[in-house]
């Protein structure tokens, strides 16, 4: 059939199927399965742990891409040698299922969150057995069908898979199971299967400890585990370029292009974008409806497309060649021709396509079928002067391809491959595979690029593995899909390709006004930490159009007004949309305007920077006039809802909307109003009618706000309650951070469908480095920076923060009994900054590299130290020049 349906847009966040669940996750250096803890064990486990002096011991990244299970949780039925499947195991495992007997089942534990392509090596079989495998992140959610919701974007559409076993072979799952700790193997049909090995081919980022450019270590084992759990959570959500397997495979000695809806089922060769004149020859066998191929393709969404409809095609015109121009996913017919004879399914045919100048000729089994003149295309069609080749099968269409050869106009072989072995697949970007690196929201679900999640994930990346390319490419994809209104979509499939043509018509798309604005905040954060001005320049027009669209949503009060059911959704997808003047949305808009001003300055547009600054100032005034409630001392949910919102008040403090004199009161009232569970704050007061779920995403903003405001004690309490709970031993511990938490009992908040490795929950990683260790950029690319530790009850912390100029390392110790603080800062070349050291009062003494620079409230310059002042319990020292600054206070 011809181009009937495009991939449906992303539905609202989360799983709309069976009951949702969250998962308890974390830190997995424990290779044993989680079990019920006895009283004696509990006493041992709650003693203060010994903190290692080597931060590398906290890193959880799999050492090898072939991940093996570490323990057998249980077996039922006739199972022999289950432990032989574990890491380092020898021998084999046999499962036997008789018609009258119990089905054999093995529940395996991989020790922590992992994900990729499950595989099973069968060494023997008897009868006609069917192997079945199910997957779960948390142990309590394992069922015969796995743990619930599969992703709507990338990955296997089911949490279990079945495989008819025909004989000895390694069975590899065709699609990714992106996140699981537990795997249940059974037989669903009678027979016997002997397995010599099972495992998962890990496909996410696998940066080892040696590649971590940022690291953190403190006197608190819990905080250390939280930091590295956040870093590993991020890694499970990072997908390297071309790592997603796509929908193609090698079957029966040929490339099997089973129908896909991603990128309309099209995939292209990873070379040849500059090829102009050539002949591409291949053999094809239609298995259902049609066989499609592309020529002069720039990517799967741009090029010439040809489709052979077989004699039984149910959606198109049987025995027809369709010819189309595809531009940014829009299809325009440039011709069609009846085939000279019927084309039967299951028969092999040879196709030759010659592109030369403005002509395209197609031969079928050596017989000319048609010639297309691309200099005289119909209205709406786009001509392509160069590009590579590819194949396309959409939906339930299916065809096989082999013996591909591409020869240039002068007779040179450009590419030749029989397409009979799996080694051929990496030459292509098939539908479902990703041409560029990207960051997903969750390892299991949704497995999509989400702009709001990137705001947290980007910071986690910059402070840990420091692979900003994942963030950059994700933002590039989002920006390329901007609508004509200026609205930037908030969610994309990771296999999406960049939009190359004019802006797509429309006012709004997935997901909401806030997720559209997050693009600006994400880009500003990327620029602040990387200094990549070239990328800012490229995206600057996108920023301008986005902020122009935001301005169209201002109401008569000068506040952003959203529409429920149109653009009023936000992070709490399980609650109803919010319409009207929503406090949190307006505060995010305020931040977007400030970020827009910073990006305008980077792009050299100083007048626009000034305009955004003025708009932000006016918006701040209106927010405080209309949405702040002086009676409660807090910001309302909206102009129509007077309840308390965690996001609005935390963001008001963090982004400076709230006057400095009111910030301490806001944080105090916020704790009194919402800190009512042992697992962290409720995101809304009970009168708002929202679900009783703790949000690590929103709590991350509150964590940053409290640290920025100097409320370190409550920040540490928040860290323990929310993230300490997720890393504690339990049936849902995965070594990673959960999407949300039930305020009732601390279980995963939405049931078995929840993501237990969710990047938006990793704020502590950047917060601990940025505030507790104390390293933050002041200007783009760390040209200037601040080191200001917030020690709380810690006695020491040390770590490293990567910058474009080199590492910035910090080591501090606190002796509160003696009111002494020692701080060593190693600074990168070509930078300057501020070192703020805690002091007991204005009259304290501060020494830098042996020179007294502060005593009795007065500053004295020293080598590399140019200014000093006292403020809020710190002496702030301006320093310049690379080197080591050893600073002490008493």
Write out the residue ranges for each language-model feature.
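Extracellular/oxidizing-compartment recognition motifs
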Residues: 40-439, 489-493, 561-562
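Structural helix-adjacent loops and short alpha-helical linkers that scaffold large soluble proteins
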Residues: 129-131, 173, 188-196, 223, ...
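Aromatic-rich carbohydrate-recognition surfaces in CAZymes
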Residues: 155-193, 222, 226, 236, ...
